[in-house]
């Protein structure tokens, strides 16, 4: 939102410098992005009247002028502007003047003729281009000799505010003035809306066919206007200083009313309309040529203003070229409406262009402002373009209901930490236009139509706090007893997991929770993911149920940057639906390892990481839990190199190598290794229990079993561990042999058994029966002792 200080002062005139007002607005939540003067620095330029013009004797394109600059005598100036003529008043820079860019004016001779100054265009003064080829022509009543900065108010300060989406009421000079009045207690004097005299019987019928999308729609016919009338300089100046280019009087009036009171408007050429103006949803495939010279194909989620023949404008966004006013326009229809913000939001992105109107409508416009806007625009049209106004015609749809909100003074003190007198609170609320009513506990207000953001008590407390001034709330350091937070013995701290992963060489990454729907099919076989109603983009249309897709994408990015050894992990939530249909989110840790097992070095032979490398990382991560790895099938993983991670009979995650079919699809030179585990299980750990170290030597026995290839060694270990007693400290596989000496379809699995007693040295008499028992249960399971 951009505006000039001089315009603001017509509605609220605080006794503050521009710099102090900038600070005040910013501290109140209306951030001032930029403040600047209306024109760059220059001096020595005055209003002058051209008295005579003669051709230069030695130059066809130059003229010798005599100028009255208020010095008491005529000044001779040689000028090359094509529009110079006697009687006009123009800016004149006299000798000793300094123009923008430190350009100094001195007496000189031009083709032998003395010239004692320069007549100026807008460009030479650093002003916005007025579209004139030549000198900047001033009004006839401009006083000769007056400093041009003073006459054109060029020391006026321009404010650019960054208005937050909840404060659409501040997207007008009136809204800013209301805020300044509340902040400084100066008088708030908004423009007085005059009721226009009715001089025409013509009316423009209106109809709302989408009442949920349009709450109010008002029209007024004005006949016999002069569309070629010039926009007054005061209006041009205010528009230009608000960042809007002057186009024509009728268009400028609509823009001016929008900036002045906050209601976007549209002006139709009445003679180009056919029947009623109708607010409706567009028909799929309907087209509209817009004022920006773009033709758009409309979707049925778009609101349009139409007549009996078809769409005339994109409601709240942009008018159509077919019904636009031009220099030949004689009769116009003024239109003002209130549109539900939700129907306007996203349309700028959908159609590839926006406007000042859409910026306001999608944030919310005062739903009681439309009639005032029509009256104000009518007043300006009659004043500038003439004509005769007809009566307003109004149609209503569904309008918002005013909300009542209570404010407890006790709660106000608790939240802000300062005791603000009730009288001061009441004054602040009144200056904000909230019209408070006293209650036993404080005040009750009915949210005004221009404040969509006032919904709960906290909103009122915020208003009081920012107007009272956060800087006026004294510092009060929190005091109290400090107590260390207690972490249960059965739960490890989160940072320990991060440190563990970093120690293993993994780097933490963060990816979007919104993912490509295809990832869900590929990596989770999830054909019914949770869909987003308004996705950021097509490739972010669903919520993830696994972390694998994001990790693979990060791997691709690293490979594109020639990083051939990648180890990353992410701790984040995944999303799904429970058995009752409700959304469920669970936190998981996912990891990916790609490339060499070790960094390249002279002392270690280079090899790619395999399943057992990443399994070791998982075992280290879960070292405080008893876990098993059970062969499984998973849509993301290689069918022979995938395992579920099981703890206490419950699957808590999976680990394995990415399925070969995804390597080509995702352009990966080799298969990465991945894992994903429930974070709750990772943080869980058993209580640490003391156990004395045995003073007696352990005994090792190595057993080699011949077993069918189809038999899993985990099954063998499970049988052996089930038959073991307290003397057995460890049973594990240390070798697998296939080849000569074994029948076809058989393999030899070597198992080490570690035995140790806490009280005695083990003897063969104690060990051999147990070993025999282990051999027996293995034989029953289908594995015979290798001879």
From Swiss-Prot:
InterPro entries: aa-tRNA-synth_II/BPL/LPL, B3/B4_tRNA-bd, DNA-bd_dom_put_sf, Fdx_antiC-bd, Fdx_antiC-bd_sf, NA-bd_OB-fold, Phe-tRNA-ligase_IIc_bsu, Phe-tRNA-ligase_IIc_bsu_bact. Signal peptide: none annotated. It is an enzyme of class 6 (ligase). GO terms for cellular component: phenylalanine-tRNA ligase complex. Binds 2 magnesium ions per tetramer. Keywords: Aminoacyl-tRNA synthetase, ATP-binding, Cytoplasm, Ligase, Magnesium, Metal-binding, Nucleotide-binding, Protein biosynthesis, RNA-binding, tRNA-binding. Residues 39-149 form the tRNA-binding domain. It is found in: Cytoplasm. SMART domains: B3_4 (SM00873), B5 (SM00874), FDX-ACB (SM00896). One of its GO terms (molecular function) is ATP binding. This is Phenylalanine--tRNA ligase beta subunit. It comes from Neisseria gonorrhoeae (strain ATCC 700825 / FA 1090). The gene is pheT.
